[in-house]
Regions:
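Sec-dependent bacterial lipoprotein signal peptides
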Residues: 1-15
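A structural "domain/chain start" motif
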Residues: 17-80, 188-197
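Surface-exposed short loop/turn segments
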Residues: 18-36, 94-143
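Soluble periplasmic/extracytoplasmic beta-strand elements of cell-envelope proteins
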Residues: 41-46, 59, 114-118, 131-137, ...
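Short secondary-structure boundary motifs at beta->alpha junctions and helix caps
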Residues: 67-74, 142-180
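Extracytoplasmic/secreted envelope proteins and their assembly/folding machinery
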Residues: 80, 84-88, 92, 171-174, ...
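Surface-exposed helix-capping loop/turn segments at secondary-structure junctions
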Residues: 95-101, 183-197
Length: 197
């Protein structure tokens, strides 16, 4: 009897030592409306991230003052690099004919424009809404002259409560950000043409 109890306790203790393998998630490009502009070279700078987001585990808001860090779900790459990469992919699709690259990638070139995003909040709140808040700037590539700077405040419902749904909603918000950037770049070009007349 003692041996079987000991064996049971040993098996349970060893089972507690093994945790399941973490699951890895990524953000994906979201197709948007193509904006007609003359070809440009555009660099997407590595986004700044609020410290609570700059980690491998996926973070969600549990309440107004509490975060839930799930060690079983992780980002497949550093979140700042991934946001920059996906935003560059989104912009490349929307600005057909332009060359768009992420600062964190392997390409470097003299850019006509630089897009900068400072992410202050990017998570799912208790109400199921995923929010992206921060600052967005577009600057001239040669002289670092600021052409546009404004706040970003977007929200979208997550289609479910799992990490896949969170990643899908976050991807959609990056797509909306790319829509706004593409429109701003198109308006800048129109303003340049008006000044040249």
């Amino acid at each position: 009897m003692r041996a079987s109890v000991f064996s049971f306790v040993l098996v349970m203790a060893l089972g507690g030592c093994f945790s399941p393998e973490p699951r890895f998630f990524t953000l994906e490009r979201v197709v948007g409306t193509i904006v007609r502009t003359p070809p440009r070279v555009i660099e997407v700078r590595r986004p700044g991230l609020a410290g609570y987001l700059d980690r491998s585990s996926i973070v969600e808001k549990d309440s107004a003052y509490q975060l839930d860090v799930n060690s079983g779900t992780r980002w497949a790459e550093p979140l700042g690099d991934m946001i920059g990469r996906v935003l560059a992919q989104d912009l490349s699709q929307r600005l057909a004919g332009s060359t768009v690259f992420a600062e964190s990638g392997g390409i470097s070139a003299n850019a006509d424009l630089r897009v900068e995003l400072d992410v202050q909040l990017f998570d799912r709140a208790g109400d199921g809404m995923v929010r992206l808040q921060g600052q967005l700037a577009i600057e001239d590539g040669s002289g670092h002259r600021r052409l546009s700077a404004r706040p970003v405040a977007l929200a979208a419902p997550a289609p479910g409560t799992d990490a896949t749904s969170l990643a899908a909603a976050m991807s959609a918000l990056l797509g909306q950000t790319a829509d706004q950037v593409a429109q701003e770049i198109a308006l800048m070009r129109e303003a340049e043409e008006d000044l040249a007349r």
